[in-house]
Amino acid sequence: MKTFILKVTLIKENDSRWSAIIPDLPGCSSWGYSQQEALENIKDAAEVYIEDMIETGQGVPSPSDRIEIFDEPAIAVSL
């Protein structure tokens, strides 16, 4: 089993929802009515995204080399 640690960006939307994106997985996004729900949903989305990449032979992108400090949380996805 392999574990991926992925940085997540959470954005508070005007309609009280939270959007979640993973910059290292282009197009991988989700949302929730709370920060916690958005994190749970983005973890599920990341698992599907990574499983699909592995199954189709695309390989999983490496984390970005940029050095940045994030206040946002990270998630761990184990496959």
Can you say where each PLM-predicted feature lies in the sequence?
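A detector of short terminal or domain-flanking linear segments
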Residues: 1-7, 11-12, 29
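An amphipathic alpha-helix/helix-turn recognition signal
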Residues: 15, 33, 40-41
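Short amphipathic alpha-helical segments
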Residues: 19, 36-39, 47
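Hydrophobic residues in alpha-helical membrane-spanning segments
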Residues: 24-27, 62
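A short, exposed loop/beta-hairpin motif centered on an aromatic-Gly-Thr core
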Residues: 26-37
